[in-house]
Amino acid sequence: MKDRLDDILMDFLESTLEPFPLSALLRFMGEAATAENYEDLSDYLSYNQLAYLNPSWNGEEPFWISRAGLFTGRTALIRPGKKELAAGVFLPGSRLVPYQDPSYLPHELTFIHNGRILPRVPYETDPDEAYPLYSFFGEEYVPQYLSLDNSANDLLFSDSDGADPSCFSLMAVDVRDVYWSGVFRAGDFLAAKVVDWAGGIFELSVVPAPEESDRDEWLGVLEESLVQEFDSIGPSASMDEQLAFSFFLGQELLFNENAVPVGDLLGWSERVDMEPYGVETRLWHKGSVIPAQS
């Protein structure tokens, strides 16, 4: 029964893009609108960060928004590396965090341009280039993500000596038509717009980088939203969850034309950095120990 209800719940959250009251979700699940069910469902959504609550100040039932609703139609910014530009490719890595459905691996995402699905091509790389592109999954998990990219990597990264291979191949997105069409200029960003969150589909285009002052203002909002997240929720279950909640807090102050790649925050901020959390990694107050959670 629980599995069936979980499936129904996820169907609703993945397909409902507009804010919704819990009463609508309970009806969809075929559950009674009792105080106990309201409380249980609210706790479940909040604990697992499946949806976010917009409090009501007028006594009416508050509304929630799903991650699909929060990020559909929104655009992640990516700064291609020199090697990617030269090869005409793009490595998704964790650069779509927190915009993407976290159940998708990077090689499972779909990218379109001018109405055409962009193919994947093998791209030779090494740890120095690839690891930073996967950093928001946590450094400790990067080898697992790389090993799952293709069958050859599964063998390379399962070598019993424990050392990661010095070079390997990843299935990159072929974006030659995007880079080399005459539209892309030095300093431009790839813009990946979420067109189907549950389907893992993004539409690629090219946008110019914002002015430095606008960039700094945007990064300041993201920084402050993360600090609020640390102080109100704690380290969460992943950096993806931390960033997703921060974008919920910032919303239109972050979903605008001044956006830059999320990873830019780490070289810019004096307040936020990646810090160890047991054997894992989280975003946290820079230089501070993350307290154990009860």
Describe each model-derived feature in a short phrase.
Residues 1-294:
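Acidic, low-complexity intrinsically disordered regions
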